[in-house]
């Protein structure tokens, strides 16, 4: 379950910012989760709550925003939207695709006090 290690990294990054900017509490965390990131959202939510315990992030609302998938098609030389990483190019039907979007998990923003 790599969601646990993802949450550990997210909480560590948030706590670094909390200390740097002297925030007293984190109320909301918005994460962008790519369609191709291979993240199970329920496992991510569970892991977030577990890892946040005992920190200033504990009790914060976790909002997950899905980043759509896209890929560069080597056959038609276009960047195309994809619903599934294994789908063929919707433009030409090619299967030689390299993902260009939807592979990351990123902190979009925080609501803090």
From Swiss-Prot:
One of its GO terms (biological process) is protein maturation. Zn(2+) binds at residues 73, 76, 89, 92. InterPro entries: Hydgase_Ni_incorp_HypA/HybF_CS, HypA/HybF. One of its GO terms (molecular function) is zinc ion binding. PROSITE patterns: HYPA. Involved in the maturation of [NiFe] hydrogenases. Required for nickel insertion into the metal center of the hydrogenase. NCBIfam families: hypA (TIGR00100). This is Hydrogenase maturation factor HypA. It comes from Beijerinckia indica subsp. indica (strain ATCC 9039 / DSM 1715 / NCIMB 8712).
